[in-house]
């Protein structure tokens, strides 16, 4: 959530930044007018309360001296009524301000490219060279069926579209991947966490999913619970409402969890395969950092995600998302896109973001600065390290062989009991 004081004192800069994120200046102007009216009413309310206090003292004095206080009482009653009217107006204005400010996206960092959509994203670097196949490549969903490791038909029967069963060496490959990912992140100083897979509405507000993106989630009827769309939500909210010791920062968390997404608005997109599912595993990274260190931590986090792809030998590229393509809470985002041979393109497999103090303000996560003793908002960061199902898809396609088998990447073999290849039955 943005700082209302910042909008008030640096309106033109904030308006220009949010315009690049699709927010109209009229919305911000209306917010500014509401804020000005609110501040005026607060002054009036305080003046009237001071007047009421004086009148109350005068009435008490008159009663002590056995004097008639009828007029003073009438005057005080009018003042009290005026205060109530103003307070009711303030409640209404506060709600209007909240309705606007809670759905405003974060302001982009100055280094973020300005653009409308993914066409304006900027490629930063590439790693690895896509393999030159001398046979016709298969899509991962066909490989999965031929190898008897992915069962889409029964997933649809048991649950519905965009669900599947992993089986045999497919299940072992999925498990090997997330264990490998977690082990690599732990080596880099991340604390492993097993989170709840349901959170409450306050947690969804804290990380920015609520109120704007409720349609993208699965809520449990007649409860305050939501299935997590990402482990970012419980990990970030772990410290919600707390003040941390500045000497402890930065703090690194990692977790593997299922992620549940309704994929609202995705009808017709990626209807086959592992790219877009309602339920998938993802290894998440979350950081809590001091403001002056957060962009250095973003580079480290992105490197941590890249490390997984490099050790798996999967070609990828790093993209800096433009202002029009970034997520709601992000101030800056790097996407990692892995090469998918059957589609002859790169597809997103990780997204690493610095939200600066946007989530921390919503969730009230602060730290006490050891230098001056002041309590300040910290910065939160989050990143995929990686989306496991998409990594399975990338391995199946990049490591496929002409005979229909798939070679298991060397780093995963110790996690799979020494298996080296997945062969057709």
UniProtKB/Swiss-Prot annotation:
SUPFAM superfamilies: Class II aaRS and biotin synthetases (SSF55681), tRNA-binding arm (SSF46589). Coiled coil: none annotated. It catalyses: tRNA(Ser) + L-serine + ATP = L-seryl-tRNA(Ser) + AMP + diphosphate + H(+); tRNA(Sec) + L-serine + ATP = L-seryl-tRNA(Sec) + AMP + diphosphate + H(+). GO terms for cellular component: cytoplasm. Its EC number is 6.1.1.11. This is Serine--tRNA ligase. GO terms for biological process: selenocysteine biosynthetic process; seryl-tRNA aminoacylation. Belongs to the class-II aminoacyl-tRNA synthetase family. Type-1 seryl-tRNA synthetase subfamily. HAMAP family: Ser_tRNA_synth_type1. Its main location: cytoplasm. Catalyzes the attachment of serine to tRNA(Ser). Is also able to aminoacylate tRNA(Sec) with serine, to form the misacylated tRNA L-seryl-tRNA(Sec), which will be further converted into selenocysteinyl-tRNA(Sec).
């Amino acid at each position: 959530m943005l700082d209302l004081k910042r909008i008030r004192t640096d309106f033109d800069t904030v308006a220009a930044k949010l315009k690049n994120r699709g927010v109209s200046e009229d919305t911000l102007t209306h917010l500014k007018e509401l804020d000005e009216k609110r501040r005026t009413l607060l002054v009036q309310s305080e003046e009237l309360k001071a007047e009421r206090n004086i009148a109350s003292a005068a009435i008490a004095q008159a009663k002590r001296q056995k004097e008639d206080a009828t007029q003073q009482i009438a005057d005080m009653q009018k003042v009290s009524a005026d205060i109530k009217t103003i307070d009711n107006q303030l409640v209404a204005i506060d709600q209007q301000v909240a309705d606007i400010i809670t759905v405003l996206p974060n302001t982009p960092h100055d280094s973020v490219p300005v653009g409308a959509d993914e066409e304006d994203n900027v490629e930063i670097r590439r790693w690895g060279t896509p393999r030159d196949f001398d046979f016709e490549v298969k899509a991962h969903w066909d490989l999965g069926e031929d190898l008897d490791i992915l069962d889409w038909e029964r997933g649809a029967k048991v649950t519905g579209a965009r669900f599947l069963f992993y089986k045999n060496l497919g299940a072992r490959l999925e498990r090997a991947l997330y264990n490998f990912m977690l082990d690599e992140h732990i080596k880099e100083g991340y604390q492993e966490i097993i989170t709840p897979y349901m959170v409450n509405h306050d947690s969804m507000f804290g990380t920015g999913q609520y109120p704007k993106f409720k349609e993208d989630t699965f809520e449990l009827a007649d409860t305050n619970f939501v299935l997590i769309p990402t482990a970012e939500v419980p990990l970030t909210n772990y410290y919600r409402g707390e003040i941390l010791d500045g000497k402890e920062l930065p703090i690194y968390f990692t977790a593997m969890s299922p992620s549940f997404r309704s994929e609202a608005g995705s009808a017709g997109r990626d209807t086959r395969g592992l790219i877009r599912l309602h339920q998938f595993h993802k290894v998440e990274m979350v950081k809590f950092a001091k403001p002056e260190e957060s962009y250095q931590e973003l580079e480290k986090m992105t490197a941590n995600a890249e490390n997984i792809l490099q050790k798996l030998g999967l070609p990828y590229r790093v993209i800096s998302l433009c202002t029009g393509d970034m997520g709601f809470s992000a101030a800056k985002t790097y996407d990692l896109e892995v090469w998918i041979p059957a589609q002859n393109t790169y597809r997103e497999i990780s997204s690493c973001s610095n939200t600066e103090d946007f989530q921390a303000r919503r969730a009230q996560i602060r730290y006490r600065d050891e230098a001056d003793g002041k309590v300040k908002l910290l910065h939160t960061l989050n990143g995929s390290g990686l989306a496991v199902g998409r990594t399975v898809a990338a391995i199946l396609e990049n490591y496929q062989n002409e005979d229909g088998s798939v070679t298991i990447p060397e780093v995963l073999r110790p996690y799979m009991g020494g298996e080296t290849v997945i062969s057709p039955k």
